[in-house]
A protein has these predicted regions:
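Short, conserved beta-strand element in jelly-roll/cupin
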Residues: 15-18, 27-44, 82-85
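A short, N-terminal "cap"/entry segment at the start of jelly-roll beta-barrel domains
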Residues: 1-12, 22-25, 92-105
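A structural signal for the main folded, soluble domain(s) of proteins
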Residues: 4-6, 41, 60, 68
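Short histidine-centered beta-strand/loop micro-motifs
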Residues: 3, 13-15, 23-29, 36, ...
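Extended recognition/assembly regions associated with phosphoester-bond processing machinery
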Residues: 8-10, 17-19, 58-60
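Structural motif
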Residues: 22, 34, 41-43, 50, ...
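Short acidic-glycine-tyrosine-enriched beta hairpin
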Residues: 47-66
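Double-stranded beta-helix
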Residues: 68-105
């Protein structure tokens, strides 16, 4: 976490996705995320559409948009994530996860 200002509703993180790894397929109910790619290449999925990403790419993920980031090649995919809105961890709804973090009800 680079910056966390909960009373103002924003948080800034440096996110690293290791080569050939991916994040959970997830969405948020109450936050918008801005992703700025600073290193590496990969793909992001937003609402069933895949996009190639590289250094300089910028993306906006709106509330309820289903999304994930995947690193490609042999380098880490690194991006700066700015969260606006409800930045609590309980606003992460995981649909698929390679690490067993999907909650079933």
């Amino acid at each position: 976490i680079l910056l966390d200002v909960p009373e103002r509703g924003y948080k800034v993180k440096r996110i690293v996705v290791y080569p050939y790894q991916r994040f959970s397929l997830q969405y948020h109910k109450k936050r918008t995320e801005h992703w700025s790619i600073v290193s590496g290449t990969g793909t992001i999925t937003i609402n069933d559409k895949e996009y190639d990403v590289s250094v300089g790419s910028n993306w906006v993920i709106l509330p309820k948009a289903i999304h994930r980031a995947t690193a490609g090649g042999t380098d880490d995919l690194v991006f700066i994530e700015t969260q606006i809105g409800n930045c609590d961890e309980d606003d992460i709804i995981r649909l698929e996860d390679d690490y067993g973090r999907v909650e079933t009800k």
